[in-house]
Swiss-Prot record:
Top-level taxon of origin: Viruses
Keyword Transferase belongs to the record: yes
Protein name (record): Genome polyprotein
Membrane-crossing segments per the record: none
Region (Disordered): 16-57, 255-284
One GO cellular component term: viral capsid
Segments of skewed composition (Polar residues): 35-44
C-alpha cells in the first residue's frame, strides 16, 4: 500500500533526448515545397510544342488571304483608296445598311413625332405600336391610306388618326414599318399555333399555302436567311399587288391659263362660235 501511495502522490518529470521542437504538420509542408518545385520543373521541361496540323515534316502549307494587296484596287494619286485590314473585318448586318429600311435616326424621329401628335406617354406608346403593327399586317402600308386606323380594346374599337403616322414617315411608311418585320413574322406564327390565320395581304393574292402566311405582309424584309420558296411567293404577291397600280409622275396641272389673248369677235349671225358668217350660208 505504501508503494502505491508513493506512485500516486509523487510527481515525475519526463525529458526528451533531443532539443528539437517537433511539429506534426511542419515538416510535411517544408518537404512538400521542394517536391512541388521539382514537379513543376519536370512539367516545364517535358512540355512539348503544339502540333501544327498544317505541317507535314519540315514543309509548311501556305495560307492565302481572301483579299490581298496584289489585286487591282481603286487608287487616288497612286495610293490605294481602300483599307484592306478594315475591309477584312467589316461585315455589317444587311438590314442595317439596306435602303429598304429607314435609318435608326429616321425611325426615332417618326416615333417621337407620332407620340407627340397622339399626346401619350412613353409607357403607353409601345401598346399603341402593337396595335399599329397588327393593323398594318392586315391593311398594308400604302402611302395612299387615309382616315383612321383601329385598335381593339376587348370588344371596343379605339380609333387613331392616320395623318401623323403617314405624314411623319420618312422616307416612306413601308420603310418605317420594316423595323417591325421580324416581330410581325413571329406574331403571325404565334397566331397560327392557335388557329389558322392568313393576313389579308395573302388572302387577296389567293395564297393557298398556310405555311407561307408568315411572309404574307407587304413590309416583310427579304434577307439572305429567307427560304427560296418563301422569297418567290413574297415577290409574286408584290408583283400582283403592283400590276394594277399606275403611278403618275405628274398630275393634272391646276395652274392652267391661256397662252395668248383671243381677239376674235363673233355675232349671232355667225355660223358657229368658232366660224364667222358665210354671207347667208347656213350650217347644215
Amino acid at each position: 500500500v505504501a508503494l502505491d501511495d508513493e506512485f500516486e502522490f509523487d510527481s515525475y518529470e519526463v525529458h526528451h533526448q533531443a532539443n528539437d521542437t517537433i511539429d506534426a504538420g511542419g515538416n510535411n509542408k517544408k518537404d512538400a515545397k521542394p517536391e512541388q518545385s521539382s514537379i513543376q520543373s519536370n512539367l516545364s521541361k517535358g512540355k512539348d510544342k503544339d502540333v501544327n496540323v498544317g505541317t507535314s515534316g519540315t514543309h509548311t502549307v501556305p495560307r492565302i488571304k481572301a483579299i490581298t494587296s496584289k489585286m487591282r484596287m481603286p487608287r487616288s494619286k497612286g495610293v490605294a483608296a481602300l483599307n484592306l485590314e478594315h475591309l477584312l473585318e467589316y461585315a455589317p448586318q444587311q438590314i442595317d445598311i439596306s435602303n429598304t429600311r429607314a435609318t435608326q435616326s429616321q425611325f426615332d424621329t417618326w416615333y417621337e413625332a407620332v407620340r407627340m401628335a397622339y399626346d401619350i406617354g412613353q409607357t403607353e406608346m409601345p401598346t399603341v405600336m402593337n396595335g399599329l403593327m397588327v393593323w398594318c399586317i392586315e391593311n398594308g402600308t400604302s402611302p395612299n391610306i387615309n382616315g383612321v386606323w383601329v385598335m381593339m380594346d376587348g370588344n371596343e374599337q379605339v380609333e387613331y388618326p392616320l395623318k401623323p403616322i403617314v405624314e411623319n414617315a420618312k422616307p416612306t411608311l413601308r420603310q418605317i414599318m420594316a423595323h417591325f418585320s421580324d416581330v410581325a413574322e413571329a406574331y403571325i406564327e404565334m397566331r397560327n399555333k392557335k388557329e389558322p390565320y392568313m393576313p389579308r395581304y395573302g388572302l387577296i393574292r389567293n395564297l393557298r399555302d398556310i405555311s407561307l402566311a408568315r411572309y404574307a405582309f407587304d413590309f416583310y424584309e427579304v434577307t439572305s436567311r429567307t427560304p427560296v420558296r418563301a422569297r418567290e411567293a413574297h415577290i409574286q404577291m408584290k408583283a400582283a399587288a403592283l400590276k394594277s397600280a399606275q403611278p403618275r409622275l405628274f398630275g393634272l396641272d391646276g395652274g392652267i391659263s391661256t397662252q395668248e389673248e383671243n381677239t376674235e369677235r363673233h355675232t349671232t349671225e355667225d355660223v358657229s362660235p368658232s366660224m364667222h358668217t358665210l354671207l347667208g350660208g347656213k350650217n347644215m
